[in-house]
Amino acid sequence: MSYAVFTMFKTAPDYRDEAISIINQLKEITLANGATGARIGMLGSGNNVGKLVVFQFFKNMGDIESAYDALLKSPLLKKAQESGKFSILYREVQKVIYDFGTHLSAQAKYVVLTIGTADDPALDTISKFADVLTSNGAISGRYGPITIGDKADGRTFL
C-alpha cells in the first residue's frame, strides 16, 4: 500500500516564477524526508487552468508526516505564504490500491487526472482499463480512494 498527495496552489501572475522556484525547493525537502517521488506541473484544462500542482508519493502515512513536518520547519513555505501571492487551494491524500506501469519520470510530459465515484473500487474494470492505457502509450498510473480531503467520502476515486 502506498499513498499519493495532490496539492493545488494559487499564485499571482507576477509571482509565478518565484512560486515555481519555491515549490521546486520544497519538492527537494519532501524527497529528503520520506517522499519516494514528486512531480510539479500546471493544470491545462478544467476549472483550474493555470494553477500549479504538486504530486508527492509515499510508502506510508508516517513518511507523509515526516515530509510535512520538515516542510513546516522550512522558511520557504512561510515566505511564500506571507507574500500574499501564494496560497494552497486544495489538498487530497489518495490511498493507492492499484499501481501500473514503469513510473519513468524522464519520459512523462503530461499527467491526466480523472476523479470518479463508485460504490466499490471495481479493480477488475480498472485493471482492464490500465491495460488499454499502457497499450496506447501511457507510462504509468495509480488508482485508489481519496482518503483525506474534501472528497474523502469512501466513494470518490482518483
What are the roles of these predicted feature ranges?
Residues 1-158:
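Short S/T/G/P-rich N-terminal loop/turn motif that feeds into the first structured element of a domain
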